[in-house]
Curated annotation (Swiss-Prot):
Organism whose genome encodes this protein: Staphylococcus aureus (strain bovine RF122 / ET3-1)
Residue intervals passing through the bilayer: 20-40, 222-242
Post-translational modification: Autophosphorylated.
Domain Histidine kinase: 297-513
Top-level enzyme category: transferase
Keyword ATP-binding: yes
Membrane topology: Multi-pass membrane protein
Keyword Cytoplasm (UniProt): no
Protein name stated in the entry: Sensor protein kinase HptS
Length: 518
């Protein structure tokens, strides 16, 4: 029985495909969905933050513009050469600055005067010039510049969401940045990969506020996660393959057992009933196999018994068909001898009784070759009484050959055929030569009788294959059919003859089956 188990392999592949690949697809879909949702949320957050920051800056700008408009007349009455007016101006400007939701610095510059709240002397080049205004004072006109260093909202966005702010002009020159990776005054070149950003217009000068986020760290985290997932997937594949193989073995164990039992049943080695290890619907198939095997065995035994009986009947029938004409002729001879030579008639009766005892023996269909030869000698002796000792019988055989076992009445028909068809007015010499070779007994029966013509020889050869009960020609046909029944195709019978030269019959009997009582 072949060791290849395609059903187990198919089941293992199916289990593997139905468990590992769905898990893998779920993980991949989950990861892609996670990043898609993450990108969508970040875009939404950036959009919200940039709009909030724009509103905050617009509010500051509006507050400053309102302040300038409201205090324009009062500034014209102040003289910045006067110490008290300078203090009043500082107080108003600081009040404006402190009211705004941003870190602002102002610079008020004019003739021989410079006022600022940048007491720490921070570099205003790193700040965004929020607005510029000309203020008229009593003694002269001054320039007011307001710088934005930061806003609480931008700081909160930077801290909580790691989103950074840029302000650029219409030529994309960076005017403000709360990220050290950008330098004020340089061109802003947005990155195509690893960054998310959104911009809005701030003022009539076409300055734009840009909120952006660097997602390289998230991508690196994603790559790390992918590596971890790949390792987990490899382990999952190995575990899944082993699990699928074990599960396939468990699921197909009973099926393989049933296939093995079918193989044993086919070779008639099934044995007694044994249930399957697992209680399942397959037990019905298992029961059916044993029932079918038992029915098949009973049928085979019945057929074998019938065949044996048929062979016995055929052999008996064949053996009986050898006798009638011989018995009739012998009885006529005895009748003739009773009046002519009672003593010789008594001898013939004794020989005939021994022959009948031999041929009617029912306990076995096999005999020693020596017994068959004795039977033939008695048969020839009776025939010589009829034909005035015209028949000369010569037997050439070794002692070893004489003790071999053959089927009963396997040689007598050859002698009967030689006497019946070879005898003429002259004497008839019959030679029986027995030799052993390769577990076969080779029998050569040669006579110097009248022989056969080519057409007659062809007819006799063809008649050997006729059915034993259909042909009218007994003798060799019966012997050939009996040999086929008892020995099968291993037995061989060949006939050679020439007109007026005699007949030679070569007969091969397998000794390996001759010892079997059929």
């Amino acid at each position: 029985m072949t060791a290849y188990k395609p059903y187990r392999h198919q089941l293992r592949r199916s289990l593997f495909a139905s468990t590992i690949f769905p898990v893998f697809l779920v993980i991949i879909i989950g990861l892609v969905s996670f990043y898609a949702i993450y990108i969508w949320i970040e875009h939404r957050t950036i959009h919200q933050h940039v709009n909030e920051s724009q509103s905050s800056l617009h509010h500051i700008e509006k507050q400053i513009q309102t302040f300038i408009t409201q205090h324009n007349n009062s500034f014209q009455e102040l003289d910045l050469t006067n110490h008290h007016d300078v203090t009043a101006t500082k107080r108003e400007l600081l009040k404006l600055i402190h009211q705004q939701p941003a870190t602002l610095y102002y610079e008020l510059s004019g003739p021989n005067q410079f006022i600022t709240n940048n007491y720490e002397h921070l570099n205003t080049k790193n700040m965004y010039l929020f607005s510029t205004h000309q203020l008229k004072f009593k003694n002269s006109t001054y320039m007011l510049k307001i710088y934005m260093a930061n806003t609480p909202r931008l700081s909160e966005i930077k801290k909580d969401s790691r989103q950074f702010a840029l302000i650029v002009d219409r030529y994309d020159n960076i005017l403000y940045a709360n990220d050290d990776r950008f330098t004020i005054g340089e061109k802003y070149r947005p990155q195509q990969f690893g960054f998310m950003n959104e911009s809005v217009k701030l003022n009539h000068a076409n300055h734009r506020l840009i909120i952006y986020k660097d997602i390289h760290e998230n991508i690196e985290d994603g790559i790390t996660l992918l590596i971890v997932m790949a390792v987990v997937l490899v382990l999952l594949v190995i575990f899944g393959f082993i699990s699928a193989d074990n599960m396939a073995k468990r699921q197909t164990k009973d099926i393989e057992t049933i296939i093995q039992k079918i193989y044993y049943a086919k070779n008639r080695h099934l044995g007694t009933y044994t249930p399957l290890k697992n209680n399942s619907e397959l037990e019905e198939i298992n029961n059916y196999i044993y029932d079918l095997f038992e029915s098949n065995e009973q049928l085979i035994h019945s057929i074998e018994h019938t065949e044996r009986r048929l062979r016995d009947i055929q052999l008996k029938e064949i053996e009986r068909q050898f006798q009638p004409h011989f018995l009739f002729n012998t009885m006529q001879t005895i009748q003739y001898l009773i009046t002519l030579s009672p003593k010789l008639a008594q001898t013939v009766v004794q020989q005939l009784s021994q022959m009948l005892r031999y041929s009617l023996r029912t306990n076995s269909h096999t005999v020693e070759l020596n017994e068959e030869l004795n039977y033939i000698e008695q048969y020839v002796a009776i025939q010589n009484i009829r034909f005035d000792d015209m028949i000369k019988l010569h037997i050439e055989s070794s002692e070893e050959a004489r003790h071999q076992t053959i089927g009963k009445m396997m040689l007598q028909p050859l002698i009967e055929n030689a006497i019946k068809h070879g005898r003429d007015t002259e004497s008839l010499d019959i030679t029986i030569r027995l030799t052993l070779a390769r577990q076969n007994l080779h029998v050569l029966v040669c006579d110097n009788g009248i022989g056969m013509s080519s057409s007659r020889l062809q007819y006799v050869r063809q008649s050997l294959n006729n059915d034993v009960f259909d042909t009218k020609h007994l003798g060799l046909n019966h012997l050939h059919n009996k040999a086929m029944i008892q020995y099968g195709s291993h037995a061989r019978l060949h006939i050679f003859s020439k007109r007026n030269l005699g007949t030679l019959i070569c007969y091969k009997i397998p000794l390996s089956r001759g010892n079997v009582d059929v």
